[in-house]
């Protein structure tokens, strides 16, 4: 959950061949928050239809918006940059697909999207999600049982497992994967997210929808912005003087990256508290209107979570339990969510990759090899390519759509990246090492 500052100036987006103006009133009322800003002055046709599958409210909103479309095509400024070779192009991919071929890929993906929907793969199974919720609740209750019988370390580890599995559930409900009525998905996300997990549903959406809309696009995807601790692209180094202590961190980031993974949950807990505390005055109407639900849910989470610590025998046990449960949960989450995108190239906004949604998702995502245990442990995110192409598709259908996605990629000459964990993790480390080498090169100039 890496939240970024947003610009709120009016802009245009193109949907179904029409340029629609997004003014302050429209932007504030957007239920998806900042995700709409990622396609500022761009064609958002495919991403709109992909993100809003089955949403009557979204299409009613679009119909009203199209009534106000300007009759003349607006002037859209070109996006240009001047990268320095050997520095700004490190870890950066290129998008060299012609407009004609890009249009063919877009049409092919639309056909795939229609086929997937016709085959019922966008429909969630209530029984599946009831089972997954009960699994996590029973895991927590068993951890309570172990704690009661003084098996404190196993109890803490089991709580960490529960934290991770709850992470997948808030992710799925925040993506509206089960209910067609999005209000019910929101309620479910408050329960598994705010109350059980301690993560803000709204904070998750605000960050994660932006990430999905502009995956690995520099300046758009907030997940790439890990400064001052890590730099995923050389552009991030420009924010610091060459003799800064931050540059020293960057020089060795590939070494200490692994050691920071367990702290992800603690970071997200803190960011959730900050986000929820600011919701009553948030720019977007949706977050202001749902602030009370999230505040109550998060307050109840910390009430029972701190109550669990209270019943431990002494402070040393409490500290051990807190750290073990949250660090285990943090590592189990982070070793998944960092694998899929940090191990692949990033793209400049000027690369034009955002003009083709399918290419964007396939070229910026790596799958983990599937298996029954991995499917459970990773919450289906080992099928990350499929998930990014169809974010509202329920977890239990991702393995079914995988052959269709492979077929689509092969037919359109697109890569389909899938590796075992250690191969993907090493590629992730290499990406951080590449930027570390750039930081070392820059700091040597002043030595």
Swiss-Prot record:
Q: Where is the Cytochrome b5 heme-binding domain?
A: 1-80
Signal sequence extent = none
Q: Where in the cell is it found?
A: Membrane
Assigned EC number: 1.14.19.37, 1.14.19.44
User: Which pathway does the record list?
Assistant: Lipid metabolism; polyunsaturated fatty acid biosynthesis
Q: Which UniProt keywords apply?
A: Fatty acid biosynthesis, Fatty acid metabolism, Lipid biosynthesis, Lipid metabolism, Membrane, Oxidoreductase, Transmembrane, Transmembrane helix
Name residues in a coiled coil: none
In Swiss-Prot or TrEMBL terms, this protein is called Delta(5) fatty acid desaturase fat-4
């Amino acid at each position: 959950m890496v939240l970024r500052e947003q610009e709120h100036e009016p802009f245009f987006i193109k949907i179904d061949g029409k340029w629609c103006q997004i003014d302050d009133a429209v932007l504030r009322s957007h239920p998806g928050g900042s995700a709409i800003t990622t396609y500022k002055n761009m064609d958002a046709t495919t991403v709109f239809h992909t993100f809003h599958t089955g949403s009557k409210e979204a299409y009613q909103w679009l119909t009203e918006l199209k009534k106000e479309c300007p009759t003349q095509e607006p002037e859209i400024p070109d996006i240009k940059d001047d990268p320095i070779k050997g520095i700004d192009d490190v870890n950066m991919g290129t998008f060299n697909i012609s407009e004609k071929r890009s249009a063919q890929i877009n049409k092919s993906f639309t056909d795939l999207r229609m086929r997937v929907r016709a085959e019922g793969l966008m429909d969630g199974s209530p029984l599946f999600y009831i089972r997954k919720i009960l699994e996590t609740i029973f895991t927590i209750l068993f951890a309570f049982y172990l704690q009661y019988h003084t098996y404190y370390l196993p109890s803490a580890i089991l709580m960490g497992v529960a934290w991770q599995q709850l992470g997948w559930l808030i992710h799925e409900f925040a993506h509206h994967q089960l209910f067609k009525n999005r209000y019910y998905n929101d309620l479910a996300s408050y329960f598994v997210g705010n109350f059980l997990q301690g993560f803000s549903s709204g904070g998750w959406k605000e960050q994660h929808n932006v990430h999905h809309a502009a995956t690995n696009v520099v300046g758009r995807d907030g997940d790439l912005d890990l400064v001052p601790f890590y730099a995923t692209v050389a552009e991030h180094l420009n924010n610091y003087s060459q003799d800064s202590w931050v540059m020293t961190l960057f020089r060795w980031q590939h070494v200490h990256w692994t050691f920071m993974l367990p702290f992800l949950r603690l970071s997200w807990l803190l960011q959730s508290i900050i986000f929820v505390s600011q919701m009553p005055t948030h720019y977007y109407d949706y977050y202001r209107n749902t602030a009370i639900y999230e505040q109550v849910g998060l307050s109840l989470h910390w009430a029972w979570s701190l109550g669990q610590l209270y019943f431990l025998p002494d402070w040393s046990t409490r500290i051990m339990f807190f750290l073990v449960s949250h660090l285990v949960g943090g590592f189990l989450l982070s070793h998944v969510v960092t694998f899929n995108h940090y191990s692949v190239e990033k793209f400049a906004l000027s690369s034009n990759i955002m003009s083709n949604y399918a290419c964007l998702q396939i070229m910026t995502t790596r799958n983990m090899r599937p298996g029954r245990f991995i499917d459970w442990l990773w919450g289906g995110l080992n099928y990350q390519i499929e998930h990014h192409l169809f974010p509202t598709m329920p977890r239990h259908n991702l393995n079914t759509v995988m052959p269709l996605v492979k077929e689509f990629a092969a037919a359109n000459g697109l890569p389909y990246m899938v590796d075992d964990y250690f191969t993907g993790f090493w590629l992730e480390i290499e990406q951080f090492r590449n930027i570390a080498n750039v930081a070392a090169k820059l700091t040597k100039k002043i030595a």
